[in-house]
Amino acid sequence: MSSSDRVTVADVMSSPLETISKDATVEEAAERMRELDINALVVPTNPRAIVSSTDVLDAVAEGRNVADLTVSDVMTEDVETVSPDLYMEEVAAMMETYGIKHLPVVDDDYVGMISSTDVTATLS
């Protein structure tokens, strides 16, 4: 396969990017993900962060009250990111290496999100 035939992150990423404040409740984050039928939201902080459905489920499984928790209590910080011009095979390798399912796409600023579902659908 020539490089011109290869699929890049920009070809597949979800955009516009959905975000949520670090001060929102975890319950609000869960409701937003359900409404949008997505599994992760970017939290516009420095360092970069996301909150995923797994973060929410972990909090519930630990017996924590998600109505009282804020996104900053459960979010994943210092997340790996990818650039829009990265090839999907490289994204698959990153996800496998780091054991992650969502990668924010960054081109100076957030521009989208790529998920393991996107990778599987593209490479299968």
Task: Please provide the spans of the model-predicted regions.
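Tandem CBS (Cystathionine beta-synthase) repeat/Bateman regulatory domains
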Residues: 1-124
